[in-house]
């Protein structure tokens, strides 16, 4: 059976309780959820990429099938394909 991998992209500046709720719900539907902290150059960031990643990791540490990554600057669909994700969470 194919592993169901989903990516949850966003600027997450900051990562909120609403984002966490979405991740929790997704973690019940998919084998793996990748929270992809992306850079939005049209927005002025409150937190650095490293700070955002640390906040996401701390918030999701107790959810076994969730991992956080700093996504490279490219189209979301290209990133999803590169990690084998067939689903994008919005």
Regions found by a protein language model. Give the residues of each.
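Nucleotidyltransferase catalytic core that binds NTPs
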Residues: 1-90
């Amino acid at each position: 059976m194919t592993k169901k991998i989903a990516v949850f992209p966003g600027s997450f500046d900051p990562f909120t309780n609403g984002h966490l709720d979405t991740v929790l719900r997704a973690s019940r539907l998919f084998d793996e959820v990748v929270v992809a902290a992306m850079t939005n150059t049209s927005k002025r960031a409150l937190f650095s990429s490293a700070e955002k990643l640390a906040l996401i990791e701390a918030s999701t540490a107790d959810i076994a099938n969730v991992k956080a990554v700093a996504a490279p600057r490219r189209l979301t669909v290209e990133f999803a394909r590169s990690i084998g994700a067939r689903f994008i969470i919005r």
